[in-house]
Amino acid sequence: MKRITLLFFAMLLTTASFAQGIFNLFGKSDDFFKNLNEKNYTAAQTFFDPTVQSKVTPAELQKLWENITAKLGPFEAADVLQSKTEGDFFSVVMDAKFAAGSQPFLLAYNKAEKLVGFFLQPKSNAASYLNPAYADTTLYSEKEVYVTALKHKLVARLTTPKGATNFPIVVLVHGSGPSDMDGTVGPNKPLKDLAAGLAAKGIASIRYVKRTMVNANEFTGAFTVKEETTDDAVAAVALAATIPGADKKQIYLLGHSLGGMLAPRIAAMAPQLKGIILAEAPARKFTDLLIEQNKYLYEASKDTTKAGKVQLDAILKELENGRITTLGTMKPDSVILGLPASYWVDLNNYNPLETAKKLNQRILIIQGENDFQVSMNDFNLWNTELSNRSNVTLKVYSDINHLLSSQVEKGTASQYRMASSVSETLINDIVAWIKGT
């Protein structure tokens, strides 16, 4: 029980083991595979450090690639499986998908961001990312951009529909905890799915690496959701207004989980937003949410032992410490449930329902009944407080879980280890709402 609680709800304690540079390497790895696929073997060789280029000739790269495609068929795409630092080197494991199967590759980079190794990896039994059927790459393009807020420069991905002008654009905001730009949880990448699904229907998006992922060292003292989320979200909205071809009057923001909870606050800070989308967004105090989640996970575990109940009671008692609304004599950087007291005070004094009531922008609230992290109790609060407002639309999906994928049951954390895609029905509904159809 304790391990599950920390995994899901300590939110910001996880320290990033790599810096901003590792995300630049994702783009380089993509480009490397594109060159191989386009038979630009000489260009592919330039990705390697000069000290190893003589050992990795264009002819050898051609032979390797032709052997692989002869066995697995034409190349389709490559997705990041994992990345880490090893001393002065960075490694990126990519899962390359071909028409007849997949093959993991390890790309080793030095500090100069040059390849010093390119290896075939053994296939893992773990699930890998599932490219959704609606992700038709002939309909959209992607490129690297940067979200800049004060001194921070975060790697981002701009996804735009091909051949379109005056298109709407959506800023995608993560949930709690350190997160990459895809919102990766196990083999699932909900923000990447959303970007692909929206772009295939003519709507652009910006998604970016969360600051707590790449600048974890800045989050050791006192901070709030301002530093964690809202500053960068507002900066991403400003960036959206500069994108060529984007309709500056059709800028939206989609917040997932904590991002959805904070979406009304962000909208108040960014009046240029046409509307906001709250996906699986808490409406209650986080302490109430965490208590409900832990009770659910305890019941789902079917633990009937006395020790299990004692442990649950201890966790619930500990969670009560997160209800503080003032610091009093407490220092802002005092740690409560793995987060500074300043964080809890700020979040507990924020009322997303009342903030949303003051907005004139359009609001879409979506909730899945198979979500065990943010439940229908939250949606019912949104519905009670906002359903009578003309600028608000609310939708419930009987099958969708917290990662916005269709599931046959509510499930537990183990569900997140299985590859699934964001519901196409949900994406189509978002598209229809944005386009006003």
Sequence positions of predicted segments:
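Short beta-strand element of the alpha/beta-hydrolase
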Residues: 166-175
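Alpha/beta-hydrolase active-site loop
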Residues: 223-244
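Catalytic active-site module of serine/aspartate enzymes centered on a nucleophile-bearing elbow/loop
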Residues: 400-403, 409-437
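Primarily recognizes the serine-hydrolase "nucleophile elbow" in alpha/beta-hydrolase
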Residues: 239-297
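Short beta-strand/loop motif that positions the catalytic acidic residue
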Residues: 359, 365-367
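N-terminal cap/lid segment of alpha/beta-hydrolase-fold proteins
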Residues: 125-165
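Accessory cap/linker subdomain of secreted extracellular hydrolases
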Residues: 277-358
